[in-house]
Amino acid sequence: MSEEEKPKPKLSPALAAKMAAMKKKQEGGEEAAASQEGGEKPKAKLSPMMAARMAAKKSGDASPAPDKPKAEPVDENRDPEPHEMAYRVIKEKFGDAVSDLDNNPLMPFFTVENVDAWQAIAFFMREDERLRFDYMACLSGVDYGDGRLGVVYNFDALATHKHKLTVKVFCSKEDPRIPSVAEIWLTADWHEREAYDMYGIVFEGHPDMRRILCPDDWDGYPLRKDYKVQEVYHGIKVPY
């Protein structure tokens, strides 16, 4: 009995259907390859957004810029938010030493207008029963590029009131000094050292005011806008 005369094994319906689908897919691939050889390449399907952009570009019309979200109007009769109540307590105590509250939705803050009062304000923020800002979450140095340096402090009252508030303190680049709050919030210790290392801000009263990332004899402060990398450090070329 020849190979052709041998009975072929009977396939299960599921396997037969699977093999038929594979054969159909293979035939479709061969047809696609043949059409490509003939110069017909399949076109990529564009997303609706990309198709609209291409149509606008073709017609010479620029896509309109999306409207910026408008700030919600402030309801003067509403109950104050927790951070607003906290600010009012601070403002009542220190008056003109602090600015008005910038009540933006992302990071409401006030500015310390009298830098000499900053330690007293900080201590009050931590100790007053109505405030209890027991956690300094972050401290960030900033070079504003107009002769001013500054520090942005983010505070939380984790144990009690659950409110948050941000404080900004400025100093001049010629005399960059701000009172330290490292003995009020322990987390400020290394944060202040980093701000000193990167911006040259001296935190007066800090227990260990020295660089924390760069070598002690490094030239300049790397995050200032006018910083220029030194070319050689102890005979070693500085890569940049």
From Swiss-Prot:
It is a peripheral membrane protein. Pfam families: Complex1_30kDa. Residues 11-20 have a biased composition (Low complexity). The keyword NAD applies. PROSITE patterns: COMPLEX1_30K. HAMAP family: NDH1_NuoC. PANTHER family: NADH DEHYDROGENASE [UBIQUINONE] IRON-SULFUR PROTEIN 3, MITOCHONDRIAL (PTHR10884:SF14), NADH DEHYDROGENASE UBIQUINONE IRON-SULFUR PROTEIN 3 (PTHR10884). This is NADH-quinone oxidoreductase subunit C. It comes from Chloroherpeton thalassium (strain ATCC 35110 / GB-78). The lineage of its organism: Bacteria, Pseudomonadati, Chlorobiota, Chlorobiia, Chlorobiales.
